[in-house]
Amino acid sequence: MGTINKKLKDISPIAVEAEAGNAGRVVYDLKTGVLKLEKELVSLPGSKMPLNLKLYYDVTHGGWRLNYEQYLTQKSQIAEWESGTDKPDVIYTDGKMEDRYFYAANQVVHESSLSDADASDYGYFENETCLNIKQTSTGWELEDLSGNVMSFDGNGKLCSVENVYGHTSSVTSGTITDGEGNVCTFERSNGGMTVEIRGYNKRFELLPVTVSGSSGWYMLAEYKAEWDSSGAVLQKSCTDRSFYRLQNNSLACVFDGFTSVEATYSNNKPSVLEKKEYRDYGASVSGEIWTLSLANGETTEKYTDFTHTADNRYSYKDRKGIKTEYGLVRYDSNHPDLLKYASITVDGLCKAPDRTVTSNYLVESYVPNLGTVTDFTTISVEDEIERMNINYDTSAITNKNGLTIAMFNLLSSQELLNMFLGMKKGTRIISVYMNAFCYDEGAMPLKFRGYELKNLAPVVCTDFRDEDGNSRYKTYTVYQVDFFGITPYALKETTQLVKGNKRYVSYKYYNSKFELVKEKGYDGVEKQYTYDADGLMTGERVGSDTAYVKTDYAFEQKTEAGEKVYEEKSTFYVDGQERSARNVYDGKKELKYTEDAKGNKTTPVFANDLLTSIKVNGTEKTSYEYENNRLTKLTHNGTKFRFGYGLGYLGSIGYETLNSLYNKRIESNTLTLSSTDDEKTVQYDTDVNGYVERYTYDKNGRLLGKKEKKAGTSSYASVIENTYLEAEDGGLKPSVLEEIVDNKAGLKYTYTYDKNRKHATKVTVTNTAGGAQKYVKNISYDGYDRVTTENYGSAIYSRTVSYPDSNDSPQERFERVKHTVNGISASNTTYEYDGLNRLTKEKVGKSSSSSSLVFENRYEYYAGKSGTNETTGLVRKEEYYLKNITAPQGSIEYEYDANGNVTEIKNLLDTGKNVSYEYDSLNRLTKETNFAIGNEWRYTYDNGGNITKKEEYNPATYCRRQ
């Protein structure tokens, strides 16, 4: 989380490590106060619990030994466990030494009735990830939940390791095999030791040597080695070499033979490493480089060379904590592994963005029975240094699953982020619940509430500012990844929009295949999606539990005309009836044909991967022709269009045939490029009567002007002229339209923008002749770039739009529209919506007061299948109410066909005023019968879809009216 100060890189909550060159590393265990020197040789594979072979200098054993570092705690060393306390490293649960658990993988939980005030206190083991130790006839077995087993003899000596795949690593006095072909052999001779690892071509030699006549030295060398068929060393080359001096059977000095670094131990005890020096072998000291002393509960580490110095100081008391000049780490008094408190200086942590989008690594989570965190301290920011504080309260909030909550403060220069960490005691952090307290005056805390355990997730913050640099609103997006399969969502993208004291949430949830399965916008409407094993959508649902639209898709394999096909069936609900549409795919899962709810079958035909024809119910409706893979001709219902090309661009569009004499349509559309410096593009549109329109564009594709030439004339007359403001400030101020001159209307429109040219705030209209002003239109916007007011002067006309939550909501739907004429309120319209954002009520009054209501419109929508809450977006009924009258004064009901076309509008209060509509197979209106006015109209179309005839009939006599 953030970049930790480099001075803390070598500080671990458990140990401070100092490299001793190739000789190995010095490990100072902060919880035990023991300092030891070790050199790792190799880790054999073949098990989830690998054999880590190390050379370890042990004063108790009087020298160097090959070490596996497997420790067992004796029964006599274990204090009696009491309810409410943490257990020691190893706990014997039954007193018979039959079952034991390693603390690092398990813990005892003490619950104080977090969920039930009447429950009694109790303690128990939570062993989901435990290591179990069992006594056998020959010794002990250590087994994890995966089935990996380590066997020890009665003295605690490791004998073998068997993994879940049946591979066994056996250990004898001279040979270690891992069951997969890797062999390690070692032998002692003449006070030394030789280790060979054939699988890695490595050989280690630990031999007593004499240096400058001085005894007590050992040489440790590592070689790249090869062996012959008899097992003898064929050749070897040294890669590492170090020398160790023993005095009184204790380690006194370590010398790295390659880097000339020597480490000297004080009082011949490996628990006190006094200094580490640069020197030549056998020569005098050439420069002090590193010292470490341990006295009176304080450790001082000093680093010095010829160019710079650095001092780190550590202090501890009762093994509870380590205090450094860079930070503080404190551990629980009952167990040194349990983090209690930490304060660490970090660089660049959680900087709040300024007009830019940045990623801040924060996280969120959920832990059952959180409890209450109290009495924590907020740190101040000094010199803009961010500080990370952890306050770990182990007693107040630990749930029955062993999860413990810590408070986590992240302070930046603009925000305070409060986070709660959930972790298994003595192990790693697994989740966080986060609050961000904005410094913006009046702002509410940003809150992300988790629902499962999470890994770290970045939070992306975007600050939207107005032209004056003031924050209008902020969005915070967190991406949460579930690596463990705990939830059905592999990825969650959650965005909070914060404005003032309002907060709105939108989200998108993805499954493990990264298919979108759930989403919700700021309007609160939720959408859900389901898929089959092949990733094809099987259903979608939009809306709330009481009002939603649902469509089901079925994708299955069938046989049609002896051919294997796949059918994708869409089932939806209209007018209380189930309707279905189909897409049928061939064996390659390429679209074969579609079938709508009325049974009309549309079939695409391809040749050389190009669409050549579209047929409806076997009749060709559209055909396509190509040259060099470019479309040159399109025929639709008998009307043919042709396309011409210039140098790589579409140059002309025209009709090859004209099927109608009733319409003056464009016959050709030609694009040409001029040779002027700005590369203006000119487009000519010509109709059948010779009328030509000429459009001119600049090199950026912006329309500069429109001219027309009437039939029989030779010159063009200007119709429209546009001018633009060019971009400034490196594009921060974009190019925008400045003026429009409409020569036909004799008017000029001039646009005024805010200083960032984001919005047009004023439109001034003048006469082109004389320049007299006609009117000025003023426009205002809210923080979400929506128009809120339009006025032409307070004495003329104004329109004010209000959105939910007094314009603090990002929703696009209107909540109120107010009209004012000549300074007097003309109307005030309010809107209400259901869970699908469908308009349910429209109230019109003279003011916002309910007493000023003039009339009200109410809307109802069609339900779906019988007995369900499924709903469509089709209006079923519209009712009109007058003020103070409970009965509707107007009631209209709508009916639709299977394609959603309105077929009848019924006047429920006067059935003699109904209106009906009829359509052809292409959903074109062919007849309109209006009994309210006693008229009927019939429409005829050409093959291009143009109305060629409109005839009027008397619906009572069916006679055509002349």
Question: Which stretches of residues belong to each language-model region?
Answer:
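Ubiquitous "structural anchor" signal
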Residues: 29, 41, 70-72, 131
